[in-house]
Amino acid sequence: MAHRFASDRDEVSPPTRALSRRRLLGAASTLLLLPIIPRIAMAARLLAVRTWPAEEYTRVTLELDSELKAEHFTLDTPHRMVVDIQGIDISPGLNELVRKVRTDDPYISSLRVAQNRPNVVRIVFDLKQAIAPQVFTLKPAGDYKFRLVLDFYPKVAQDPLAALLKNNPQKIDEDPLAQILADIGRNPKGTSMASLPVLPSSIAPSSSSRSITPYKQERGRRVVTIALDPGHGGEDPGAIGKGGTREKDVVLSIAQRLKAKIDATPGMRAYLTRDGDYFVPLHVRVEKARRVKADLFISIHADAYVRPTAGGSSVYVLSSSGASSTSARWLADKENAADLIGGINLNVQDPRLAKVLLDLSTSAQIKDSTTVAQTMLGELKNVYRLHKPQVEHAGFAVLKAPDMPSILVETAFISNPDEERMLRNAADQDKFAVALLVGISRYFSANPHVASIG
């Protein structure tokens, strides 16, 4: 009996040991998978829903604790957009989205939310017009977690220039400089460098001279267009003060005040890159200004720093290194070289002449921008203290258009409690707007040659 057990043990032992090892490995795998399986099955948690309706486009944002996938399609008669969001279940937060639709939304009239199938929620947007939607996700950034973004753009994009002319139909006269450059474009190889227009130098007014020279539109000269760019907007609040003041709100208010003053000035008109609480990408801000053939671009901001004592106004222009980088990219882009040379369509066939004109445009932009900035700094000093007494240089993407003087104005430090209160005050906002208006007027009075040449 003992021998038989020993013999059985000898024959059966090897497979038994192998089986035991397989069982142990299987058990270990199960243990490793246990914490993962509930994670996979768990639906994402909705943290917030936000809507940003605007004439330009409406944005709907869903913020979640994990990344999701979404599919969408549109339907006609009537116009609708259907969005299927995977990895989420119906929740009170999604029902809240229904209540966030505003009656004045240009694109969305209503929406419905339902659990389409397990872990898939369907949102149906009833639309007021045909749209060209964009649906994408964003990784965590700033204070935000994962975001699913739904943008509702019009099927036919709005033209900033048409809107500007409709709202401010001042007569646009022929620009002789543009005509000269157009002639060059028609006959590039027969053009010598001596025939290129020579622009007079831009000289900043003396800092000791504080007399105000009102801008006067000369006969035959077209209306001057100023593009005002209130920073941030929509999902991007900009800097936030200790008292909860958001940069995007105060700079929009200052820009709107300045626009009203510019529009009331003969020979001038203003265009806002955003006129409400919505987000505009940096390159779109520049393209808008170029589309309306702006003669000057002013980006308006409120500064912030870790030390609450930091304060004062600042003015920035593009650094020469930044401008060189932009030029290098554009010159390397053969597709754009024929149509966009510093934003100036010259129809130039000679690449050597095109490069010279682009270099001239870039150099003139930096030179004129610095002149504007110096003038603005002097006027801001009249209404408030300066953070630094000289113009600052940096590679701001929004200042990289080579065909118009571009400056960025930091009105004050929203991180400074005293200046935060000042930025909230309507009278102080008006003072900043007046200072900028006077700076604009002084600049164009001293430099009447500066004009867009599109």
Where do the PLM segments sit?
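Active-site-adjacent mobile loop/cap segments within catalytic or ligand-binding domains
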Residues: 70, 296, 306, 357-454
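Signal-peptide-cleaved, periplasmic/extracellular N-terminal interaction regions immediately downstream
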Residues: 2-225
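Flexible glycine-/small-residue-rich
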Residues: 64-66, 85-87, 127-129, 152-154, ...
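Catalytic-core regions of hydrolytic enzymes
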Residues: 184-351, 362-374, 421, 434, ...
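Short, solvent-exposed loop/turn elements at domain surfaces
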Residues: 71-72, 92-93, 235-239, 417
